[in-house]
Amino acid sequence: MTFEPTETLRDPFVLYGESFDSRLLLGTARYPSPATLQAAVEISRPAMVTVALRRQGAVGEGEGGQAFWQMLKALGVPVLPNTAGCFTPQEVVNTAMMAREVFETDWIKLELIGDDYTLQPDTLNLPDVAETLIKEGFKVLPYCTEDLVLCRRLLDVGCQALMPWAAPIGTGRGAINPHAMRVLRERLPDTPLIVDAGLGLPSHAAQVLEWGYDGVLLNTAVAQAAYPVNMARAFAQAVEAGRTAYLAGPMPEREVAQASTPVVGMPFWHAENTEHRA
């Protein structure tokens, strides 16, 4: 009997040549309190925490912003600044430059919003902005849709990982276009893909990891849960379970039933009935 120990199923999560222990990224907005955020991060141990520079006051606008930044540093989790709230390419570039100075990192989650109602990314300008940031030395993680052509264009300009949505930000609906998401995974097998928006339940996270996605980024699903700390733990466990299931090689789906018990060794009267039915 062949048995693969669980240890051999663990594989590194690599982004821009850097390895991370977790496949969960966690947003820092909309928590009931800083203490709740801190506890959620501590229990889920994400690879990174995302911070919106334009909304958190991390530049030092008052004591609140400084306290927030000090708390993040004390947690010891890498910070991924984002450009949330930016609607023009110039806003994105300015925010990214400021974030690099404030947080002392070249990592940036690129958000360029094209519609303030759906919060859909501006897919027309996104590749050009990504290229500009990459030329400035940033490690760009672009928030995008599941559109294959857009994702290829982002790779062409130098992005080494992508963050397609499952559904619009904050909707919690899970993957609303499973076919397109699975096609995207199949067509870009060597690209790290992190599902960025629209997940509401741990089962949603497990599902996309089972499809072969490399990680998930969560915020509202944890921050707005009745018990955010418990939900953070549940998502961390779901991500691990989904990835382990993917690596384990799930059985193929079938259209018809197939008995799990073999005919060999069945009582003779059952075997007889089987032969007659055949």
UniProtKB/Swiss-Prot annotation:
Source domain of life: Bacteria
Pathway(s) annotated for this protein in UniProt: Cofactor biosynthesis; thiamine diphosphate biosynthesis
EC number(s)? Answer: 2.8.1.10
Query: Which cysteine-cysteine pairs are annotated as disulfide bonds in the entry?
Result: none
Q: Which residues form a coiled coil?
A: none
Q: Which residues form the active site?
A: K109 (schiff-base intermediate with dxp)
Keyword Cytoplasm belongs to the record: yes
The family database entries (SUPFAM superfamilies) matched by this protein are listed as: ThiG-like
Any one GO CC term of this protein is: cytoplasm
Sample GO molecular function, one term: thiazole synthase activity
The record, for InterPro entries, names: Aldolase_TIM, Thiazole_synthase_ThiG, ThiG
Where is this protein found? Cytoplasm
> What processes in GO biological process is this protein linked to?
thiamine diphosphate biosynthetic process
Which residues participate in 1-deoxy-D-xylulose 5-phosphate binding? G170, A197, G198, N219, T220
Name where it mostly resides. Answer: cytoplasm
Protein task = Catalyzes the rearrangement of 1-deoxy-D-xylulose 5-phosphate (DXP) to produce the thiazole phosphate moiety of thiamine. Sulfur is provided by the thiocarboxylate moiety of the carrier protein ThiS. In vitro, sulfur can be provided by H(2)S.
Family to which this protein belongs = Belongs to the ThiG family.
Quaternary context = Homotetramer. Forms heterodimers with either ThiH or ThiS.
- Supply the name of the protein: Thiazole synthase
Encoding gene per record = thiG
